[in-house]
Amino acid sequence: VLLRSIVNRHTSRIEQTHGLCIHYDKLEMNGLNEIYLQGLSVIPEQRDTLFTLASTRIKLNFWKLLTKKIEVSYIAAEDIRLTFTKQDSIANYDFLFKKDRKVPSQTSGQTVTEINYSERINKLLNLCYGFLPENGQLKQIYITERKDSNFVSMVFPSFIIKENKFRSTIEIHEDTLTRHWKADGELKQSANTLMAKLYSADSTKVSIPYITRRFGAKVTFDTLSYSMTKESNGKNQLYLNGKAKVNGLDIFHKVLSPEVIHLDRGHLGYQMNISDHSFELDSTTTVIFNKIQVHPYLRAEKKKDLWHFTAAVDKSWFPADELFSSLPKGLFNNLESIKTSGELAYHFLLDIDFAQLDSLKLESELKERNFEIVEYGDTQLSKMSGEFVYTAYENGMPVRTFPVGPSWEHFTPLDSISPILQMSVMQSEDGAFYYHHGFLPDALREALIYDLQVKRFARGGSTITMQLVKNVFLNKNKNFARKLEE
């Protein structure tokens, strides 16, 4: 009776706040640490059923209960159904994006407490780890998303947890397509550790559902693994470290590239530090894509509702060919198959303080040592040394192709153009053309400051060199890949 009274009080508050109807057929406590629940349903007002649960039996850690902490040691559940439906503009989950019906009023004498990120995330992770049992079995889990006549369904016939290790098969149904995945891993409450691996049950790649219909994108991979360990020093400082690996990754979206982007091997070994008002990706973090390895540093700090972002990468001397042979296929078409020798080093810094945008720092420096292009790849980068063919585009469509050189009747050599006209073009487009190496970091910095101030892309910082490269070598598709190549 006491258990039902406590549960009813909490569910009643949730019902009033979010406009839900929460019902159960049976709720009882067996002994001091076992709960049995039957016939649970959650139905938003005037909407389709969101969640149903046939039955579940949960065993709690008795000694943790004495310290007012919840830790699940065993769980058994059957027929769990989570269904997201949307018909036209009406969805059974839109309550998640609405303001609560009852908002506690604040008196003028009250002060607003700032969000403590480390404390909030620590509480959330402790809650999640507490609900992850050491042993259990979940049968027939259905997660479905349905919009009009389209749907995606994930079915877990059986999710088994034994001595902290779990495994499951997953059936994916998307409209007329069916796929089969496997998942396994390990979770340890005592060590605050989670490890998981996802891969296909057959020889095909794992294809992420829903995103093709929703975003026009396609993502596939061979295997994906992830691990995370939580540590805390109890002084508003939280540490998350772990690894993420992906093999055989293919990504397609027209905004990224007109071709499929392929990555053979990607690895992230991360160390994240979270304080009461900041997030930091430590410089000990390692990112590996194919053969190249970098150690990025990221920091986001909030002060008086304004953010301060810092990003930095310092890569000491390394063989130049490691970079060019590691570039993902489909992202740098003009550099594919290029062969180089020598060494490169790179430094990058971006520091944006939204409280003082004029203090923005942008540094990017690529150093070379005995660098040479041994063999051109798919694109002859030296073609401007002689006559070449150019295609003019308008609104993404080719309108005219002609040679740039003496064979074209309208070709005019540079020494035949008035020096005054030459100087006028340079001063209006790129006054330091003869004094830089293709980039003007200060121009890019000033353009970025202005764009952030007006909150739109209003000014560019391209030099004549960058515009020349864009027009001669790059395609006319306005996407992320073209900007990276430029």
Regions found by a protein language model. Give the residues of each.
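Extracellular/lumenal and peripheral-membrane lipid-interaction modules
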Residues: 1-23, 215
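Flexible beta-edge/linker motif
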Residues: 20, 25-144, 157, 164-199, ...
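Juxtamembrane regions of bacterial inner-membrane/periplasmic proteins
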Residues: 72, 121-133, 152-159, 163, ...
